[in-house]
Amino acid sequence: MKVIATNKKAYSDYNILETYEAGIELRGTEVKALRESGANFKDSFCRIKNGEVFLLNLNIPQYRNGNLNNHDPERPRRLLLHKKEIHRLIGKVKEQGLTIIPTKIYFNSRGLVKVEIAVAKGKKKYDKREDIKKREINRKINEYLKRNR
């Protein structure tokens, strides 16, 4: 598995509850651009329309050696999931007020582009502060243990 890009902001802004692996419908130049320069997750999210899941605002830069048929960098991209998974996502988003965000995009062992999406709940400001405090405490404990070995 070769990771192309990760959404680092997702882990600090959301509590990740479940993750799913989804295929993504891409054009030829998009795959070449992913191999060449990666992707940008800034402000990207998933939306469900007519029983299909779409990934919005994922920026895949244009392929340098492309021609007139080069792709639009921020076009909506359809995610490929099983129908049961889509129904489960619809239920969670509608009933519990959760959101679907992309966390990682990568090439699997067969060379196909996959997106890891997560069902997540947004963190409040005080939740973020608690996470920072926990991280600092763990860092201090580890530092103390290293010094006293």
From Swiss-Prot:
Entries under InterPro entries matching the protein: SmpB, SsrA-bd_prot, SsrA-bd_prot_CS
Any one GO MF annotation of this record: RNA binding
Gene Ontology terms: biological process: trans-translation
Gene Ontology, cellular component aspect: cytosol
Statement: the UniProt record of this protein carries the keyword Hydrolase: no
Subcellular location as annotated: Cytoplasm
First-listed, main subcellular location of the protein, grouped into a coarse class: cytoplasm
Keywords: Cytoplasm, RNA-binding
PROSITE patterns associated with the record: SSRP
Cytoplasm as UniProt keyword: yes
Role played: Required for rescue of stalled ribosomes mediated by trans-translation. Binds to transfer-messenger RNA (tmRNA), required for stable association of tmRNA with ribosomes. tmRNA and SmpB together mimic tRNA shape, replacing the anticodon stem-loop with SmpB. tmRNA is encoded by the ssrA gene; the 2 termini fold to resemble tRNA(Ala) and it encodes a 'tag peptide', a short internal open reading frame. During trans-translation Ala-aminoacylated tmRNA acts like a tRNA, entering the A-site of stalled ribosomes, displacing the stalled mRNA.
Protein family membership: Belongs to the SmpB family.
Name of the protein this chain belongs to: SsrA-binding protein
Lineage, uppermost ranks: Bacteria, Thermotogati, Thermotogota, Thermotogae, Thermotogales
